[in-house]
A protein has these predicted regions:
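Glycine/proline-centered hinge or cleavage motifs at structural transition points of membrane proteins
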Residues: 142-143, 156
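Short coil/turn motifs that cap or connect alpha-helices
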Residues: 57, 145-146
């Protein structure tokens, strides 16, 4: 019985790997997760630097707001995003003629971005906080502008935290389900397709897709972790 189940699972996995709709959904998960991570990096790194280096009124409130996506239920996050980015939403309505978020790729990216950005921002902030600001000040006293001191001193020293934060951000983005289906059920990403197959066809049809998604993401995750570990050894040397 056990051997028969293994054979059935393997054959189902091979069949899933040949299914274009499955491959498209998994690729879309990886692609939109990458876009969400890229946007998180572009917006989150400057925000993390400001939070690590500057004191201002309301700083703790800003930090708390940035952490809201980590603790709020993701269906609630999806409803909030739908209210803002839907066709009649605060942002979705004015931009409806330019870009649509409801059941569209931008909506998937927005949902992933919302739930994953705090992981990168918090990791980057920790990295910047661990760097002695006197190193930047020394570079600036020698005539280096702020952007140059950041690019050639602060950024390399915080690179490991930035890489780890990016990995966690990407992993969190591609695993998101609740917020994504509320804002953009279509086009289907991997988790949405698994849910669709499970509710319509049962466990036997959804399990191979889940296993395939795990294998693909785990492989990429291990590679990124190995790069991070190698980076750590390089820094120590």
């Amino acid at each position: 019985m056990i051997f028969e189940q293994i054979v059935l699972d393997f054959s189902g996995l091979v069949e899933a790997a040949r299914d274009n709709s499955v491959l498209e959904a998994i690729f879309l998960s990886l692609y939109t997760g990458f876009l969400a991570t890229l946007i998180s990096f572009i917006l989150g790194v400057p925000a993390a630097y400001i939070l690590a280096r500057k004191d201002f009124i309301g700083k703790r409130i800003v930090e708390s707001i940035l952490d809201i996506p980590v603790v709020v239920p993701h269906t609630v996050a999806g409803i909030a995003l739908l209210t803002i980015f839907g066709a009649n939403g605060l942002i979705g309505a004015p931009l409806d003629s330019i870009v649509q978020f409801r059941d569209a790729l931008p909506g998937i990216v927005v949902a992933m971005l919302f739930v994953s950005a705090p992981y990168l921002t918090n990791s980057a902030r920790e990295g910047f906080q661990n760097i002695d600001p006197r190193m930047e000040n020394a570079a600036r006293s020698l005539g280096a502008p702020l952007w140059k001191a950041f690019l050639f001193i602060t950024f390399p020293l915080a690179s490991r935290h930035l890489l780890i934060g990016s990995i966690m951000c990407w992993a969190r983005a591609i695993s998101e389900f609740g917020a994504v289906i509320m804002l953009a059920y279509y086009p289907m990403v991997g988790p949405t397709l698994i849910y669709e197959r499970f509710t319509s066809m049962g466990l036997s049809e959804s399990r191979p897709i889940a296993v395939l998604l795990i294998l693909v993401t785990l492989t990429i995750f291990v590679i990124l972790r190995l790069i991070s570990s190698g980076w750590r050894r390089y820094d120590r040397d």
